[in-house]
């Protein structure tokens, strides 16, 4: 059995749908976040998709569980057993000023416009409480994050900054999953962090993975037009 992995979707459900329809033999797919479109909408897909939050989601829809039946949201710090594969995740981005805030208290005030409300919604972040919950999990096969671990250098210039986040490394060191997948940066990368294979996924329109359910060896695939 193989399962699939998608990078950030950003509302490109047409590309996601084509990929899933190309592989009717794949029983389920996982995704590293940023699923919603610019209007906060989610569309059904032809196979189950298990996903963590990115920083671009409709957090009201997630909180109310108002999602298509094929989209299965994985909350931070919890594990799900999917066809014999144990998957857990730490979705969202890192904000140092909010890191010690309880997850339930992350602010999401209503503003005068819809755009301002979205920008003010801090539920896009993960917090220490959720990192500790992830570190306490056991026997995780695949760990999903939206952020990259350190070091992660985006771009090619000489003054590149490390865009990785240390809490991700902390979880990898404690959890030791068999495979780590992340998104956010829209680039396919392969590295090892804390003794764990750590793979950055590209946008759904540019590539995806098929993963062997026994060995967790993967193959990068390029979508067909």
Task: For every predicted segment, state its role.
Residues 1-45, 58, 138-139:
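N-terminal active-site segment of His-dependent metallophosphoesterases
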Residues 85-158:
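Active-site-proximal loop/helix segment associated with metal-binding centers of metalloenzymes
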């Amino acid at each position: 059995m193989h399962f699939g992995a998608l990078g950030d979707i950003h509302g490109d459900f047409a590309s996601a749908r084509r990929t899933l329809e190309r592989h009717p033999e794949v029983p389920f797919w996982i995704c590293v976040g940023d699923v919603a479109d610019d209007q906060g909408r989610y569309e059904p897909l032809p196979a189950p998709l298990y996903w963590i939050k990115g920083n671009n989601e409709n957090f009201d829809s997630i909180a109310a569980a108002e999602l298509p039946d094929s989209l299965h949201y994985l909350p931070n710090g919890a594990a799900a057993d999917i066809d014999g594969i144990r998957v857990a995740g730490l979705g969202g981005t890192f904000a140092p000023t909010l890191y010690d805030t309880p997850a339930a208290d992350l602010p999401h005030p209503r503003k005068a416009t819809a755009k301002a409300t979205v920008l003010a919604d801090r539920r896009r972040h993960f917090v220490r409480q959720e990192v500790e919950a992830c570190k306490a999990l056991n026997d995780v096969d695949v760990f999903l994050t939206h952020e990259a671990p350190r070091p992660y250098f985006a771009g090619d210039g000489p003054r590149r900054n490390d865009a990785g986040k240390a809490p991700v490394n902390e979880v990898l060191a404690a959890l030791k999953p068999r495979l780590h997948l992340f998104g956010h940066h829209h680039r396919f990368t392969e590295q090892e962090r804390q003794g764990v294979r750590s793979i950055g996924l590209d946008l759904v329109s540019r590539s995806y993975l098929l993963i062997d359910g026994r060995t967790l060896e993967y193959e990068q695939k390029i979508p067909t037009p």
